[in-house]
Amino acid sequence: MIRYRIANTRFAHTPKGKAAMTILARAVSIAAASITVGSFGLLAGPALAQPAKLGCTSALTAQGTQTLHCPTAITIVAESGAKFELRDRNRDGHVDSVELSNKALLLEVPKKQGRTRFDVVTPQAIAAVRGTKWAVDAEGAKTSVFVVDGRVSVARPAGRGSVVLGAGDGVDVEPSGDLIVKRWPPARVTALMARLGQ
């Protein structure tokens, strides 16, 4: 918690002084709240982006999405306000996993000899791949995975069942129930891709 104190002067007890001190106190409160929110990484809205790391560069688009380009030819497009964290599981200095807690990501991971499996981890699912383009949407207690191109394996973190998706396939992963692969209707695909500026 950030504490602040405004000096007690004679000016502070006049009507103009009280108004000025009230404005100053509000400004300090807003600044303190901004610092506190920023330090916990609670980012949302089209103008705010997650910091790029692990050698990735970041750019905001006109649609409010954020595009990360990583040195290993991995591209990640994040929906405006998406909450995610890039990870380097094998500690080689390159991103090989993303933890997604809210909203959607579109990922393109080219197939490369010797590359470790790339994962997107949400509270409900792990989507693993070795060369494809796919989207993952974490919303509340459900994670949806859709494959644009290639193949993606989807499983629950606890290992209770898994499925493999091909191009045009999707699956909704909820806390219980079977993982059912479905061909997504064009309207659903279009709506998800629009959120990702595609």
Question: What are the residue ranges of the model-derived segments?
Answer:
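Sec/Tat signal peptide C-region and signal peptidase I cleavage site
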Residues: 42-49
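Bacterial N-terminal signal peptides that target proteins for export
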Residues: 14-38
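Flexible, surface-exposed loop/linker segments and immediately adjacent secondary-structure boundaries
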Residues: 50-198
